[in-house]
Each structure stands twice: as C-alpha cells, then as structure tokens.
C-alpha cells in the first residue's frame, strides 16, 4: 500500500529520508497530489510552485539538499512575506502585480537549511480583517480564521508540513486554534521581520504553524541559526501555572470554557500547581491599548494605500480610527503597556509562574458570514510581546478548540 507521506509531520519525514524509507521526490509528489485533490475546496494557496520546477530545483542541487538539515522538504509562507521573483500581493488588488527582488529573512533561513518553498498562502487584506478566499478544511462554511488563513488551512489539511504566518493581533494563534494546528509566536524581536510587509511595527511578529510541537521547535531553531539536532521537549516535574479564561474580554463559548477547565483539572491531578491570576483588569486594559496602538500605526504605515479605492470597508474603518488618534495618545498607550508588562513579569518571577493558560480563541471557528473570528483572546499578550503557542485541546461539533499558553 502506498504511504501517505503528506500526513506525516516534518520530523518524521526527515527520519524517513535519513533512514532511506522514502525519497524526496516521493514525499514531494505526495504533497502535490494532496494539493491537487484538496485545493479546489480549501483554496489555501495564493501562488503555488509547479511540481516540475520544485523537483528540478532539488535535482539541480541534490548534493546540497541531501546533506542539509531540511533535506529539500517543502515549506510555505503567508502572502505578506516577500519572496524573490514571486508575487507578494498582501491580499490586496492594489499590490497584485508586486514582485519583490529579495526574500524575507525567514525564507532565506529556510532555504539555507535546505527547505524548498512550495508556495504562498492566502492572507486577509494587509493581514487585517477582510477575508480572502480560503475555506476551513473541516467545514467549508466556516472561516479558517485570519489573517494567516491560508497557512493554517494548508497545514491542517496536510498540504504542507510547515507554513509561516504573521501576527499583529491574533493572526497565528486564532487560525491555528480554529484549524487544529500548533501555532507559535515568539517573543517580540525573536525572529527577524526583514522584508515582511509591516502592519503595525510595535506589534508585528512572525509565526510558525505546524502539526507537531517538535516540528515547531525544529523550525524555530532554523530561524535562530541553531544546530538542528533531534528535538527533545523536556518535561518539568512540577509546573506552576495560572489561568485566565478571557470572559472579561468578550463572550467565550461554554465548550471552550469546559475544555479549559478540564485541562486545568488534569494538570492539578498530575501534581502541578495553580496560582490565581490577579491581572484581569489589566488584561482588559491591555486589549484596549492594543487596539489604539494598532490603529495608530496602521494608519501611518498604509499612507500609499489610502490613496487608492481598492481598500475594504474594514481597513478604511481602521484607518479612520487611527488617524483620529494623536501622537501623544499613542506614546501614552505605549508607556502604559510597558508599565503593566513590568508589573506582570515581576509577579510571574516572584510566583515562579511557568505559563499562563488561556483560550486560544473564543470558541470553534464561526461561520464565514460572521467574519474571521474575534481576536480578543490574543491582543493583551501580543501587545506585551510575550511568547505564545496554540495547541489543539478538544473538539466540539467535530471542530477544533485550541489552548493558548503564554510564557515570559
């Protein structure tokens, strides 16, 4: 029986190549066959490299790829991440013909480690709220989330083992939660943003979307120029954790709250320690501050685009809000965020908090008629610049629910 290599996570594909259980062309063909079958329904791709061109690149540099850490395996990037010679339209008709001359740093790092770009994934308009064409891989009537919609859908549907997204509010964590993937956003400044189209520079982050935490660790090591030894996740004997359920920020579904409570009880039953979370009011304030900072910066970054008629009503509304904010209000918001961050980090240090548990989204993916989903569960952590990860936690109506972990 023919192996379905496309269903294997990255680290297992690497093992198969290292042991001779599979060849690179065999694995790549498996992914292209999956894309050919599923893309008409999911519509995750903005631009796809032709299979013949992919394999020709591998064959022309076969010795390099066989000796490289990633062995020529495929990766994808969100269509706000520059790729030399390949269009980067940022989900907007305004930039439909834009072809960058340089790769983004994350693309360069992946290529240097032996990854081969398979394509660009669909993004919402300028990585904000206006949805693209992508459907949820488990239910075409539902949103895959935004703005890294194509990246999450492509990974969740086994069309590619690794995809990069970006997050300014909740654009990696939320779609990862909706689609049932692992979504990782590093600490502010952990990954280079060079040649990634900016939305709000104080908030923008690069994210990794995968189907396994070991794959996320491997790709994190690639971006940080670390040696790619076999990834090992070390378990801590006793975890000190706190829980924030997000109900003060907006409506969180009963199913999400029940899944979070079950996770909490499981940790306690295994001897881990919970500390009460005392910063609910600050989380609400941070969420509002995030909105102010984002609106101010987006309005100043998209000056060129404001002159065009192709902007969505969503984006026009954000620009209107941002232009109404003064520089003094913006600076005050940044200062307040920093003050809260220092208090929170001091408390986490004193209490020896390893992780904050929270919903990764308000619930399962909503119907597309309701938009791309509410981002309020990530705004506070994103404005603080803390590292976050979304992990598949449970299912409701056969749709994934994600757990968000926030660290220092």
Where are each of the predicted segments found?
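Short, well-ordered alpha-helical
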Residues: 1-99, 127-128, 365
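Gly/Ser-rich, acidic/histidine-flanked active-site/gating loops
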Residues: 6, 72-75, 84-87, 221-289, ...
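Short, well-ordered beta-strand elements within core beta-sheets of diverse protein domains
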Residues: 12-19, 95-98, 204-211, 320-325, ...
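Acyltransferase
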Residues: 21-29, 59, 255-278, 299-306, ...
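Conserved hydrophobic/aromatic pocket- or pore-lining residues that grip, position, or stack substrates
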Residues: 31, 78, 110, 267, ...
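Short helix-loop capping/hinge segments that flank enzyme active sites or metal/cofactor-binding pockets
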Residues: 70-90, 292-345, 392-402
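Glycine-rich, small-residue loops and helix-cap segments
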Residues: 72, 112, 116, 160-161, ...
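Short glycine/serine-rich loop segments
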Residues: 102-223, 382-395, 399-404
